[in-house]
Amino acid sequence: MEEMVTIPRSEYEGLKSENAQLHATNQKLRDEIALMKGGRDSRTSSTSPSHDICRSNRNSLRVPSGKKSGGQPGHTGHHLQMSDTPEQVIDHTPEVCTDCGKNLEDVPCGSYTRRQEIDVPPILPVYTEHRSHTKICPSCGMENRGVYPCRIAAPIQYGPVVEATAAYLSVYQYLPYKRIVQLFKDCFGLCLSEGSIDSFLNRLSNKATSIYGNIRELIQCAPVVGSDETGCRVNGKKHWFHVWQNRWLTFIVAFAHRSYEVVENCFPGGFVHSFYVSDCYAAQLKTPAKAHQLCLAHLLRELLRFEKHLRSKWSIKMKALLCQALELKEQMTDDDYLNPPTKVIEINNRLDELLAVDFSKFNRKEQALVKRLIKNRDSILTFLAYKNVPPDNNGSERAIRNIKVKTKVSGQFRNSDGKGADRYAKIRSVIDTKIKNGQDVYAALLCLAEG
């Protein structure tokens, strides 16, 4: 029979305390492992969906609206309309009687029904020859020669429609050069080279310089501006696309880095007349502005991660508070921004209470979030004080998504002069701005090519 060992109370208390510390450390490490293994994905952080390890069973921040799928009551539908002036009419007349077999060729036609088919005719290249004629002045004998249009600068060259179409396919439809070459050959019977397409984009971006500059000036004095950035590769090296946008304008620029120097270079003095919406990246928060608004979509994804993997009560409460603020935003009237209702005051008070908690025992990453929110407390609920300030930066993320799709489809920007990303940024800025203002993209590119 084993003999019971007696230890002093002081030693027992020490072992008990050490055991409790080990349990706490063990739980903390388990929480961190859970975060590192499956915590960061496109739903719970700003990580892109392509980096998700497991893409099944996706959860969304959206909640059911209660509406049925499809068109909603009051929605104006669209369907094919017959033309009153068809370009071609084909008559189908009966030749013999289907009952007795009598020949009906000489019988006049009576009533008829009609059906229409819409198609696109084959597109073939059209060669236009420009001739510069000479005339001798009968008065002084001077030989005068006709002047070619400014854009006709070579013995033979491609026209503006070819240039605009290539730019449309490359920048707006994301196609790589090789596919554009194949499309022109198969659909138009025109054999382009990849070098020709690169030259088209170079000329078009040069012509877009003045519009690009105007967009930058308008963005800097806009009442609300959102900003974001994303990585890309240019000739094998890491670069960054930065975007500044609002409801009417989009300005994109490519840089070799993502520091605050980019903001200083593009927008000296910052946005002192604008409400600035962004994520919590330091260079964005450092940008001078009338007031900042943190992207709540980013914050909600982080809180969802802590709720899902840590079962954090604090994160659940903060997430519920931000969702309540978003619901209140949709219900507020113009007068509510002049005289804040009680609910706005209550939400601000509850936010202060949540940020005043003792977070020393929180998970390390959750602590970092709390500290970040405390530091930027005045930038969390700006949207409840000003009508035109959005609560998220989704507009900037939509602008960035076009760039990510381009790099996914076409790969990196590879140009001998290293300016491919700059050309894309210019032309895409013009395209996105035209779209936001309800203008035809192809017509705008054609106008640039003809200029």
Q: Residue locations for each model-derived region?
A:
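Short, flexible loop/hinge motifs at secondary-structure junctions
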Residues: M1-A154, D198, S227, R233
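Catalytic center-proximal scaffold of phosphoryl-transfer enzymes
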Residues: E2, T6, E13, A20, ...
